[in-house]
Amino acid sequence: MPSLPQEGVIQGPSPLDLNTELPYQSTMKRKVRKKKKKGTITANVAGTKFEIVRLVIDEMGFMKTPDEDETSNLIWCDSAVQQEKISELQNYQRINHFPGMGEICRKDFLARNMTKMIKSRPLDYTFVPRTWIFPAEYTQFQNYVKELKKKRKQKTFIVKPANGAMGHGISLIRNGDKLPSQDHLIVQEYIEKPFLMEGYKFDLRIYILVTSCDPLKIFLYHDGLVRMGTEKYIPPNESNLTQLYMHLTNYSVNKHNEHFERDETENKGSKRSIKWFTEFLQANQHDVAKFWSDISELVVKTLIVAEPHVLHAYRMCRPGQPPGSESVCFEVLGFDILLDRKLKPWLLEINRAPSFGTDQKIDYDVKRGVLLNALKLLNIRTSDKRRNLAKQKAEAQRRLYGQNSIKRLLPGSSDWEQQRHQLERRKEELKERLAQVRKQISREEHENRHMGNYRRIYPPEDKALLEKYENLLAVAFQTFLSGRAASFQRELNNPLKRMKEEDILDLLEQCEIDDEKLMGKTTKTRGPKPLCSMPESTEIMKRPKYCSSDSSYDSSSSSSESDENEKEEYQNKKREKQVTYNLKPSNHYKLIQQPSSIRRSVSCPRSISAQSPSSGDTRPFSAQQMISVSRPTSASRSHSLNRASSYMRHLPHSNDACSTNSQVSESLRQLKTKEQEDDLTSQTLFVLKDMKIRFPGKSDAESELLIEDIIDNWKYHKTKVASYWLIKLDSVKQRKVLDIVKTSIRTVLPRIWKVPDVEEVNLYRIFNRVFNRLLWSRGQGLWNCFCDSGSSWESIFNKSPEVVTPLQLQCCQRLVELCKQCLLVVYKYATDKRGSLSGIGPDWGNSRYLLPGSTQFFLRTPTYNLKYNSPGMTRSNVLFTSRYGHL
């Protein structure tokens, strides 16, 4: 009888014993497909033969995908790609070539396009040797040679194949009659007096990164290669025309010469670094700044020639892309530049697929930096793919359900409907531009942090230089795309293009006010809701789906950075939706006008002021009663609506006597108001000077000592404070830091000025402008106050026609000082709570959302006998109730 199986043992065929001594043993293994890690950036490098590209991909933490994978975040190819491939790319993908760049990378195309631009702007394009394209310009070349013979002059010409590379087929001639007329050749005048180094001729390989063509963005790498000839240079004559090692500087040619010197250092051998070359120039009393300026100008002007072709081809490949969207293309170009004996740069050629071979250590050092910094500038994030899919889904729903779309205006619509329609269109245009500006600010901040050895040369910071380049761009579009030049000119001249974020917000506010007046609603001065102090770490915001738990903060550095960018974008969207409530109130008026006036303005197609009856309510004394001021005329805004209250009107003039009496009484009333306002401003300044920021758990004296200690050791704390304020805190948290000061002021001012609403005080509106300036450019305004430009915020008053009195300016200066102290105390508290900012792990960057508790920071405000009880004490003022209980 067979025995029962033991419990838990499953009977079956006996397993094969693989540990046998048979001569053959199967070694076949099951292929296991490697899974992609969630949140990993992928790269397809099947199209490159250069190992340095793969090494940099690994160093960046990207995961290489199989050759057939076309969904990678990054695709790298050595050769140019077809336009169909670019058309098939998703928005989250990047490929390292632009369509249409061959217009300057092929020798014949470059010569043809440069010739056209030279005809239009001869004084701007003097850096290209005179060139002829054979066979089309064979006759012109022969005529030029005959003219030289008549003048008894003889020049040397260099002959190149039209689409050659690596020095193949290049020769020098002095007799132009011997050239064949039907071959496809490029003939250039030879630069006979080059700048020599140790007696050798050389050229420069400059690396250029183009990250976008719509709009154009160009970066220059501040290093490169100096490629020297391998025979001492002698001006060309009949006996040495064939000595190519003397006249050509191509590495692919000179490396075959026995005199080619390979050296591991950057200051010896036949190949050296541009970094060493600039030091050489400086040591020999040459102007290095002018050298880089000339190189930058040459590069930008050359790419301006390519821009019409590249932009047209790119838009054909990517139709329907909204302006300002991320470019799926980028390109690393190699510019070959020759210097003459006066250090003037001459453009030889441009390589769209520069060699990334690393035969020597100097190649590895330079080219690794070029690639590594370029990939960092691209800002490829793990969340790009997910956000792209979500955006596509939202766009599909919008098209399906007609969401957020403006209804068409029907024929025969009334004037009221036409005005509403124009306002809606204007608001949509402004919101789109606002989103573009915020994206651009975010990109520029990332570029400034990750530029490495690159420098942005277009668009330049110099306004005059930018205007010069834009004029050249307009000429280039007119020259190469004459049929589409008008549309490009309209884009270039769009008044919204040069506006900053705060200007667009002002225009949006204007449209909102016009809309409310058109609808017959009561217009209220709007501004951000008062926030009492710092946020709690557990109640920071309503998190989106991508931020489900705090455990996500423990991810890799690249993932954390992408999540940070994603949260920033989420906040931008949130701000955009609430744009009505985040607008800066502006009640400065210049001229007394009828409230019912309707005027054209840049802010909206038709400015409408509601015809409301005059109000009988009297308002408290403030600067607004003195004079009515409109917003200034500027390049970005030509006019703005009159926002004066309905009670300020022209008085009817029955006769000359009544008119004279009313003018005298009005002057006396304004004089009395001015004196009272100065007195109240002095009281405000006195209170502001006594205000102090208190460190949690410490006395006033101890808090002052902490601030003084930070200031005394500013060299040590400067970088840490900058990192905390500009990087670790986003714009929402920065605003909440300043709200500690702002809330205290909102509490004090009504008691001094004896008004129920602080918004009615002109000084508070000035304070609001200062707060907005301090938060300008993601907190850069406040940080400038710690630097040499500590009074840069005062420039906001230079552009305004409203006169700010010395007392008001002193109040603003004290306000800025309180904000600086507040930041230092919050920074110190965060440092003590978390430990040294420099001694913690990489996950510290995510602590930007973990700010100190809200009830621990406050301004100690002195108590004065102000004898005014606000009828509407808001919840945000609860911190100060105990201190003003006796009032």
Curated annotation (Swiss-Prot):
Protein name: Tubulin polyglutamylase TTLL7
Residues involved in L-glutamate binding: R227, Y251, S252, K271, K367
Naturally occurring in which organism (per UniProt): Homo sapiens
Chain residue ranges for the region called c-MTBD region: 388-450
Effect ascribed to mutating E349Q: Loss of polyglutamylase activity
Keyword Chloroplast: no
A GO molecular-function annotation: metal ion binding
Gene field: TTLL7
Location, primary (coarse class): other
Similarity comment: Belongs to the tubulin--tyrosine ligase family.
